[in-house]
């Protein structure tokens, strides 16, 4: 299904200029993840982050997240880029940040991780499925367990929660309100009004 992308017109002293809404928001250093995270989404988000870093390495980037999660490797590509680039990446949850979306929300710069009040946040262990020979299934099972351990370690680092608690809580879907996510350490502040 294709969607109409709104066009905004900006008036300047030199005349009018029209932008699609995403390009206009990018001028304000705002990036959106507005759906499942796959390689295509990751490549777009990473390209925008690298562009904004080249434009001004000292100015924050604002990453808005409304995502049910997605592919671990795609999410980790975004995560690694967030940690690699010079500008702080402020994360803001709107709607929901689940699974890899919640992980990226927690990975924002300390003190700059936010959620709107009625958003929901959910963490859980990696999901996966494989079929084939027993050896192949074993290889993939060990890889999923390795990724689970890596994600739990990183959530421990970003939230300040003990690893044992993260392991317990991610055993099944663990839903939180914005206020609960703040208490958990996934975000720093619940925001109701833009400052």
UniProtKB/Swiss-Prot annotation:
It is found in: Cytoplasm. The lineage of its organism: Bacteria, Bacillati, Bacillota, Clostridia, Thermoanaerobacterales. Its main location: cytoplasm. Belongs to the peptidase S14 family. The gene is clpP. Pfam families: CLP_protease. Cleaves peptides in various proteins in a process that requires ATP hydrolysis. Has a chymotrypsin-like activity. Plays a major role in the degradation of misfolded proteins. PROSITE patterns: CLP_PROTEASE_HIS (PS00382), CLP_PROTEASE_SER (PS00381). Keywords: Cytoplasm, Hydrolase, Protease, Serine protease. This is ATP-dependent Clp protease proteolytic subunit. GO terms for biological process: protein quality control for misfolded or incompletely synthesized proteins. It catalyses: Hydrolysis of proteins to small peptides in the presence of ATP and magnesium. alpha-casein is the usual test substrate. In the absence of ATP, only oligopeptides shorter than five residues are hydrolyzed (such as succinyl-Leu-Tyr-|-NHMec, and Leu-Tyr-Leu-|-Tyr-Trp, in which cleavage of the -Tyr-|-Leu- and -Tyr-|-Trp bonds also occurs). It comes from Carboxydothermus hydrogenoformans (strain ATCC BAA-161 / DSM 6008 / Z-2901). PANTHER family: ATP-DEPENDENT CLP PROTEASE PROTEOLYTIC SUBUNIT. Its EC number is 3.4.21.92. The active site is at residues 99, 124. NCBIfam families: clpP, PRK00277.1, PRK12553.1. Fourteen ClpP subunits assemble into 2 heptameric rings which stack back to back to give a disk-like structure with a central cavity, resembling the structure of eukaryotic proteasomes. One of its GO terms (cellular component) is cytoplasm. GO terms for molecular function: ATP-dependent peptidase activity; ATPase binding; serine-type endopeptidase activity.
